[in-house]
């Protein structure tokens, strides 16, 4: 009997704790990914399209295609 009461109180406490600490979900999925949605409407706004530190055509790259903006490297960026 004591064990049943302890288990019941523990379950009620954990349930209440879950509701108290849960995030506010009134907005639902409305603002879940606002930045991604903006970038889908305007692909130029995506930071993934920007390549900082890449070399333009004609620059020496050795054998590392990641150094070229075009991702094509045969000793020089093409």
Swiss-Prot record:
Disulfide bonds join 54-69, 61-73, 68-77. It is found in: Secreted. GO terms for cellular component: extracellular region; host cell presynaptic membrane. The modification 4-hydroxyproline is found at residue 65. One of its GO terms (molecular function) is toxin activity. InterPro entries: Conotoxin (IPR004214), Conotoxin_d-typ_CS (IPR012322). The keyword Cell inner membrane does not apply. PROSITE patterns: DELTA_CONOTOXIN. Expressed by the venom duct. Keywords: Cleavage on pair of basic residues, Disulfide bond, Hydroxylation, Ion channel impairing toxin, Knottin, Neurotoxin, Presynaptic neurotoxin, Secreted, Signal, Toxin, Voltage-gated sodium channel impairing toxin. Residues 1-22 form the signal peptide. Residues 23-49 form a propeptide. The presence of a 'disulfide through disulfide knot' structurally defines this protein as a knottin. The cysteine framework is VI/VII (C-C-CC-C-C). Delta-conotoxins bind to site 6 of voltage-gated sodium channels (Nav) and inhibit the inactivation process. Belongs to the conotoxin O1 superfamily. This is Delta-conotoxin-like AVIA.
């Amino acid at each position: 009997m004591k064990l049943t009461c302890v288990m019941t109180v523990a379950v009620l406490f954990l349930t209440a704790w879950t509701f108290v600490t849960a995030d506010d979900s009134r907005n639902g999925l409305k603002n879940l990914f606002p930045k991604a949605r903006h970038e889908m409407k305007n692909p130029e706004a995506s930071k993934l399209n920007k390549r900082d530190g890449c070399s333009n055509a004609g620059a020496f790259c050795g054998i590392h295609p990641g150094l070229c903006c075009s991702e094509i490297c045969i000793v020089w960026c093409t």
